[in-house]
A protein has these predicted regions:
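A glycine-rich, acidic short-motif signal
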Residues: 1-65, 69-76, 81
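Conserved active-site and cofactor/substrate-binding residues in soluble primary-metabolism enzymes
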Residues: 2, 24, 28, 62, ...
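Generic secondary-structure signature for well-ordered alpha-helical cores
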Residues: 4-9, 35-39, 45, 72, ...
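Short glycine-rich or small-residue beta-strand-to-loop segments that form or flank ligand, phosphate
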Residues: 13-18, 127, 169-175
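N-terminal nucleophile
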Residues: 41, 60, 64, 82, ...
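Phosphate/diphosphate-binding glycine-rich loops and adjacent basic-rich segments that engage nucleotide
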Residues: 50-118
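Small-residue-enriched flexible segments
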Residues: 87-149, 160-162
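Catalytic-core signal marking the mid-to-C-terminal active-site face
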Residues: 155-255
Length: 255
């Protein structure tokens, strides 16, 4: 919110946060800017789960990015990604299902690529685009922890009492560049060009970032959210331990 207020004054607002903790989905703070007809950027560092290119152990984090921009189509364009090929949550799912995972996701503790999720959970994650993801993750640490005077690299989450995570928030006030309705019209034209592109064989529709999530949100609001059964049970158990009301019923539905 501070970045948004700064953007109202000068067109762009940049805030670095230190001594923080997990801030959830990076799309959430980015979308706060969209609600004010701005472009939002949010990124955070994280625990050292990603191996630098050529290394066998983790030094940088998954370091997610969220970038959100308004459109005139009823939903914002939202990119919400971690900089690793996959996260350990997905690997846990593969492990529970007894399945092998792709080789380019993670390394064993010895630095070997593996398709065994159990071995991967003990090792390090790999960056998207090989060395490119590592480079982006390192520079995310620079823009958050190093610049903000907070934790970076091996430090975040190393001390449970002080998790020392750092974030970067940027808000860009579109009205300083052009009327927001003109921006939305230009966005819609751009999206139209993307959706009109020649499709690959077997592809029914070309989507833009955030579109699947928008459709899923509409479905969940109408029909209820779908959760992995294990996660549902974990949430119910946690609520019971904390004496929190959990007014939801476990209903098995077809995938």
């Amino acid at each position: 919110l501070l970045a948004i207020e700064k953007a109202k004054i000068s067109g762009i607002g940049t805030v670095v946060v230190r001594n923080s903790t997990h801030f959830g989905s990076s799309a959430v703070p980015a979308r706060l800017a969209v609600e004010q007809d701005m472009i939002g950027v949010a990124m955070t560092n994280a625990g050292p789960e990603m191996a630098p290119w050529g290394a066998a152990s983790g030094v940088v984090g998954t370091n997610p990015w969220g970038i959100a921009a308004p459109s005139g189509l009823g939903f914002p364009v939202v990119l919400d990604i971690a900089l690793t090929t996959a996260g350990k949550g997905m690997m846990q799912w593969y492990q529970r299902e007894g399945k092998k995972m792709p080789l380019d996701w993670a390394l064993t503790p010895d630095g070997e690529e593996t398709d065994d999720p159990a071995a991967a959970m003990k090792g390090a994650l790999l960056g998207i685009g090989q060395y490119k993801g590592y480079g982006l993750a390192m520079l995310t640490d620079v823009l958050t922890g190093v610049l903000g005077g907070g934790g970076f690299g091996l430090v975040p989450y190393s001390n449970p009492a002080k998790q020392d995570v750092s974030h970067l928030m940027i808000a860009i006030d579109i009205n300083w560049f052009m009327p927001v309705e003109e921006f939305k019209a230009r966005m819609d034209a751009f999206i139209g060009d993307i959706k009109a592109a020649k499709k690959r064989p077997g592809v029914e529709e070309i989507l833009v970032p955030g579109e699947i999530d928008h459709r899923r949100e509409q479905d969940y609001r109408q029909n209820g959210a779908r959760l992995d059964a294990v996660i549902f049970d974990q949430l119910a158990e946690l609520a019971q331990k904390l004496n929190i009301d959990f007014p939801f019923e476990r209903e098995v539905v077809d995938a």
